[in-house]
Amino acid sequence: MLLLRAIRSMMPKEERIIEQFVEQARHIVTASEALEAVMVAEPDERGERTAALKRIEKDADRVAKEAGRGLHRTFITPFDRSEIQALINALDDCIDLMDEVPRHAALYGIDSFDTPMRRMAGIIRRQAALLTEVMPLLTSITANAD
């Protein structure tokens, strides 16, 4: 019993990986709202709103890097290590892609976003909201498998 306690005390503690997924999901929601704001903005307001989206992306990158470092320090993970890394990357990619929209629009000379593009941004926002609902379910992944 004493030996088991000693071994456990030396093992790395589980990092807050799931909490970081939840935090990333919240960043995705915020980024999707910022993307919508960019799309409805007048051209003279677009720079400020694009900068806000960039700030969200930078903060989300910080969380993704922390999650990656935490994964490498963790001995026992809540589920497969490669799946955790893939999820970290996928969540980060969501925000990175949203962040690229204003830059690519400017590159291709798109001055305004038409209704279908704005609708697509709304779909992205609604899907992002779903992420904030499902990420906490990862804390009890086996109970929620069905």
Q: What are these model-derived regions, one by one?
A:
Residues 1-146:
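Cytosolic, long alpha-helical scaffolding segments
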